[in-house]
Amino acid sequence: LHFWLPSTYANAPGPVAALFAIMSKVGIYAIIRFFTLIFPPDSITGTVATDLILPAALITLTLGQLGVLGTASLTRLAAFAAIASIGTLAISIARFDVPGLTAGLYYMIHSTLISAALFLVVDLIAARRGGDIWLRPRPPIRDIGLVSALFFATAIAMVGLPPLSGFLGKLMILNATAGDGWRV
C-alpha cells in the first residue's frame, strides 16, 4: 500500500485516481464488516482487530504523512494524503467498539469525499499548468483564484482544520481512542 499506491494514483488520470480513492475506502468498510461478523469483541478472538490493525494503522499513518512532507508532485501529495487518511481511519477501527466504529464511519464519509475532490482539483491544476511538479517554475495559470481556492479548501479539509468536517471526524477518533488506557 505504501509503495505502489502513490505511483498508481500519480500516473492515473484525475477521475480514475478519485475513483481509486473511493475504492480504497470500500476496502476499509469491508474490514469493518469482516471483523464485526467474524471476530466479535466479546469472543476469545476479540483482540485480533486491535492486535493486527493498530500497528498497521500507525505505520500507514506515519508513512502517509512522511510522504506528504517529502514529495514534490501534487498528485503524489494527494496520494499520500489519502494513505494517511486510511491510517487515521484504521486507528478508529482498531478500537473495535461503538465509539471507535462510529467515529470511523463518520470520518470515512468525510475522507472519501475529500480525497476524491483533492484528486480532481490536483488534476485540474496539472492540466492548466502542464504538469504537477509544484517546485518547477511554470507559466502562471489564468483564473488562478478559483482553482487556488478549491485547492486550499480541499487541502485544509483533508488536514482536518476547524470548522470543517474533517476536524470533527478526527476529534471523534481522538475521543474514542482516549479510553481504556490507550495513549493518544
Predicted regions and their residues:
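Short helix-boundary/re-entrant hairpin motifs in multi-pass inner-membrane proteins
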Residues: L1-L52, A79
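Hydrophobic alpha-helical membrane segments of integral membrane proteins
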Residues: H2, L19-F20, L66-I83, T102-I109
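Interfacial and helix-entry/exit segments of alpha-helical transmembrane bundles
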Residues: F3-A21, A79-S85, S115-A116, V121-R183
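Internal transmembrane alpha-helices of multipass membrane proteins
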Residues: P13, V26, A49-F96
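Transmembrane alpha-helical core residues of multi-pass small-molecule transporters
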Residues: S24, T36, I59-T60, A84-G87, ...
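Helix-coil boundary and interhelical linker segments in multi-pass alpha-helical membrane proteins
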Residues: I32-A49, L89-Y106, A176-V184
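Structural signal for membrane-spanning alpha-helices in multi-pass inner-membrane proteins
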Residues: I32-T36, G64-Q65, L89-I93, L118-D123, ...
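Structural signature of hydrophobic alpha-helical transmembrane segments
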Residues: I44-T60, Y106-L113
